[in-house]
Amino acid sequence: TDLLWGLRGGGGNFGVVVSLEFRLHPLTTVLSGLLLYPLDQARTVLHRFNEFIATAPDELTIRSGFLQIPDGQTVLFLSPTYCGSLEMGEQAIAPLRTFGTVLVDQMQSVSYHELIHSNDAFTPKGRHGYLQTQSLEGLQTETIEALIEQGLPLPSPFSAINIHHFHGAASRVGVSETAFALRQDHLMVELIAAWEPQDDEQRYIQWAQNLSQALASYAFKGGYINLLSEQEQERVRLAFGSNYERLLDLKRKYDPDDVFRSTIGHLAPNSLTR
């Protein structure tokens, strides 16, 4: 029982899962796509987005952020996904089109398979990348200003700021029910620095680190566990929060020699955090 608890958020710290049975839920098509807005309307759109998601239904999740389109222009995007009837989905996302001037509207009904693979083109083989994350309770004036004033311009056409919307059923799980500790509605800001192999990586890494630091004082402690590096052990501890000591006990019990150490969210059994 303890091991199963630890696996739900504790990653590969305790072993390798060789067999898994899980329940599927039918989901054939979803309403999804991109809405693009001009950069000079970003503050207004993001404030309205922040107000809107407070009452969003479970069936709707909305990513937001900044990206560069093929003509070199940086734009703000909203990317809703509605898992339900097309008619209800259209009603749910209709207000988003009033938040500002919609430059491009790519909302459409797509298969779930298409949705899962819709970002494949952004991660071609050979491209280098570096990620930082901060989780915010919401967007306030200060965080919006940090995103715009310190995050832009993006350091390359392949880089982006991706704001993930976490809410619904996952927020109704008790903090101690699984190892994953952040069980409340929040926004996870993913800072994606990407560059070609011949470029100077330090410029891109510095961009992500500087923006992450600018957001840190407004963020929950830690970060998104799946995107924390081996060098961010203190953030790993903070991300697991009140579940960290229980996870550490499991690590010491089942893997005291740290055989399973090449893992995201690594727990060192000899940790001196007690």
Question: Across the structure, where does each feature detected by a protein language model lie?
Answer:
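Soluble FAD-dependent oxygen oxidases
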Residues: 1-274
